[in-house]
Amino acid sequence: QSQLQEQVLRENQEKGGNRSTGQSGKESKTMAENKAGAETETAETDERMASDANPDIRVLLCSDNYASEYHDRITITADVPFRVSGQGTEWHYQAGEQVEFTMQSNEFLQGDLVFTMEEDGVFQLPYLKRATECPSYEGSLHVEKREEGLILINTLPLETYLCYVVPSEMPSSYPIEALKAQAVCARCYAMLQMENSRCEEFGADLDDSVSYQVYNNI
């Protein structure tokens, strides 16, 4: 009987060891899967946070001397090759080529047009009167024809936008701490406008005049 008990005990120990080994393998696999899933989720979260931290802002560019939201004519060029997309068609232009249109340009403005650069550079608006004779704009440009006139929107990352707002609102000769404070205020204000836009009727978050905060008047 003693031998029988010992044999049963050994068998139970072996079975228990096998179950323990099998469970350990399953747990290891589950832990590895959970770790991989967590790493993927973390990467996606970081990407979303980076995007959320520097979202695109849409700026309605007013006409000469900020007189109106509408333009009678628009002339656009760039210091790099650029393209114009709209109406299911795409046009390509070389650096320095100008695209000009007015309210009478019906064949060209049957719908919205989007201007994008094919490499890093800036768009230039030689017709527009600002502090400089030919103001430059990063990002993309959006042109739309309405009954009242042409509207022009500049879309670019928020942080890039702020680089053009701060020197437009405050001289660069001011103390650095004052400039930092201005940047913080400008960012908070811009993000508030992005959440509760008064320019939504134009498809923009705000405009470039003193009605909001002056943009790219340097």
PLM feature spans:
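Conserved, single-site charged/polar hotspot
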Residues: 1-218
